[in-house]
């Protein structure tokens, strides 16, 4: 069962809390979980690090969680000092080993700026960046082959705590099948280049969401939100990215990204409530 507490006017489930001694999200909702990335610990049995970070001296270090199950900011700042920190790897907490990584410096998303942990609503955030000089945006790539972690063609559910940080960004993609294209000045109604999506595809902060165009995707998601997607993946495509990387299209800035295989509609609202219980988005 999920315990419920009250903080101010916000109901919080135990599965949404990150403090020690409380039930973690994937302890309650771990069935058919295929990938799980977060700035907090999601599963009690997970003993690995949160992410691997490169500092301004190009030294890489795995950063774990503190005693409360949150990203260890003390260790992170000791590593980065007064400089910047960039994400080399974001470790999968599902137990399946699907690390997201970026080994090239320029496309690495940022987590520390000038000795300060980047945050949104009080929680660390992996921040997307665009580099006009190289025509690149930041992105993280799932270690191939993708089918090891996302084995079947068909229905998947995606839960992401995220925001559009740059004027051009893409939530995720398979090869060139792009999902939720945010572009600040574009009136294109092509907000995804992927036909494999089901009815009622999107929910934003627990309610149905239908973007009008790419500019609408950018503006309506420019602050922290919980995006839920009921979609499909194709196991004939070997690549999977958070972000895109070319034509200045970066990753959406992100705090959490969780993927389930199969139909999770019966748990959808409960998972959203649990996630919101930790991040206090809406």
Language model regions located:
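Short tryptophan-centered beta-strand motifs in secreted/extracellular beta-sheet-rich domains
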Residues: 157-159, 195-231
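Short polybasic amphipathic segments
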Residues: 49-53, 189-191, 200-203
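N-terminal amphipathic, basic-rich helices that act as targeting or association modules
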Residues: 18-101
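Extracellular, beta-strand-rich glycan-interacting domains
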Residues: 5, 41-56, 65, 89, ...
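Enriched but not universal
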Residues: 1-45, 267-282
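Flexible glycan-contacting loops in extracellular carbohydrate-active proteins
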Residues: 189-191, 195, 221-253
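Short amphipathic beta-strand/extended segments with alternating polar/hydrophobic composition
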Residues: 58-70, 141-144, 181-183, 198-215
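Extracellular glycan-recognition modules
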Residues: 87-90, 94-197, 261-273
């Amino acid at each position: 069962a999920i315990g419920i507490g009250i903080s101010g006017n916000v109901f919080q489930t135990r599965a949404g809390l990150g403090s020690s001694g409380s039930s973690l999200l994937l302890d309650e909702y771990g069935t058919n979980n295929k990938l799980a990335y977060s700035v907090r610990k999601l599963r009690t049995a997970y003993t690995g690090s949160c992410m691997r970070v490169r500092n301004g001296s190009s030294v890489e270090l795995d950063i774990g969680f503190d005693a409360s199950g949150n990203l260890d900011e003390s260790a992170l700042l000791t590593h980065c000092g007064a400089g910047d920190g960039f994400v080399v790897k974001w470790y999968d907490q599902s137990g399946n080993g699907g690390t997201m990584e970026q080994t090239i410096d320029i496309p690495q998303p940022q987590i520390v700026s000038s000795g300060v942990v980047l945050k949104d609503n009080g929680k660390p955030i992996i921040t997307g960046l665009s580099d006009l000089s190289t025509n690149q945006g930041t992105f993280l790539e799932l270690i191939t082959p993708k089918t090891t972690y996302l084995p079947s063609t068909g229905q998947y559910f995606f839960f992401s705590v995220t925001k559009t940080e740059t004027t051009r960004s893409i939530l995720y993609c398979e090869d060139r099948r792009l999902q939720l294209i945010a572009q600040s000045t574009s009136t294109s109604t092509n907000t995804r280049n992927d036909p494999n999506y089901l009815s009622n595809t999107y929910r934003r902060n627990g309610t149905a969401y239908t973007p009008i165009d790419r500019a609408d995707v950018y503006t309506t998601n420019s602050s922290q939100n919980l995006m839920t997607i009921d979609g499909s993946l194709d196991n004939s495509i070997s690549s999977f990215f958070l972000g895109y990387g070319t034509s200045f299209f970066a990753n959406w800035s992100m705090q959490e990204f969780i993927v389930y295989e199969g139909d999770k509609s019966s748990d959808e609202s409960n998972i959203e409530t649990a996630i919101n219980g930790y991040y206090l988005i809406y």
